[in-house]
């Protein structure tokens, strides 16, 4: 298994990556924004993505987005192929793309919005802190990317103040003065997630 910076030589995997993201969102019922093969290819050609390969077989992927003229960076689209789940690969990909982000954008704040407890745990281990959406980028092009998420109506109903996703932020300036990243409490995050779902998800008619 190798995890490398994606480039033009990996564009043949773009359709499979796009389909894997879409299938994961459908099977898990989670809010994951869809990404077209063309969008993924652009990320690869710009050196803004990492890919995990088991020989010639696709195993995982994640890409970098920058907002506010490089002041904010997001690691998005983290996905592991079903054949390679349950072995800690997602964590390795997350660490690789985070390191790559810090090298390309050393002064940028790195943020994440996610509904997944596993991703929250990985973010917390890297030094991310939970924040309100107002502390994230106000770049409209970022929030436009949420339109393909099935929970987008929640974001619009709350005037972009809250969603089922939890916002998390790594601030390099604050990190210098706060070496303690804190501990991830899964019970607390699970309760927060359940509260959001109960409050914002529309009940299905019987």
Regions found by a protein language model. Give the residues of each.
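A short beta-loop-alpha structural element at the N-terminal edge
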Residues: 1-17
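Conserved residues at beta->alpha junctions
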Residues: 5-8, 80, 114
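Loop/helix-junction capping segments adjacent to catalytic residues or to phosphate/diphosphate-binding pockets
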Residues: 11, 83, 87, 117
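A conserved beta-strand-loop-helix scaffold within acyl/acetyltransferase catalytic domains
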Residues: 18-82
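Conserved acetyl-CoA-binding loop-helix of GNAT-fold acetyltransferases
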Residues: 80, 86-101, 110-112
């Amino acid at each position: 298994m190798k995890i490398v910076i994606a480039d033009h030589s990996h564009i043949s995997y773009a359709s499979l990556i796009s389909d894997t993201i879409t299938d994961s969102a459908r099977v898990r019922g989670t809010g994951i924004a869809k990404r077209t093969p063309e969008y993924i290819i652009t990320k690869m050609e710009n050196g803004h993505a990492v890919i995990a390969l088991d020989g010639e077989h696709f195993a995982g992927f994640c890409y970098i987005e920058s907002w506010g003229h490089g002041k904010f960076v997001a690691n998005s689209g983290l996905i592991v192929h079903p054949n390679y789940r349950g072995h800690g690969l997602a964590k390795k990909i997350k660490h690789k793309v985070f390191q790559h982000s810090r090298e390309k954008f050393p002064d940028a704040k790195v943020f994440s919005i996610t509904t997944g407890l596993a991703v929250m745990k990985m973010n917390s281990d890297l030094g991310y802190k939970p924040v309100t959406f107002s502390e994230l980028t106000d770049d409209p092009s970022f929030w436009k990317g949420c339109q393909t998420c099935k929970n987008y109506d929640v974001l619009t109903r709350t005037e972009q103040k809250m969603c089922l996703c939890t916002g998390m932020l790594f601030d390099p300036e604050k990190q210098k003065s706060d070496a303690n990243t804190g501990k991830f409490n899964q019970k607390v995050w699970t309760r927060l997630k359940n509260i959001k779902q109960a409050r914002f998800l529309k009940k299905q008619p019987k």
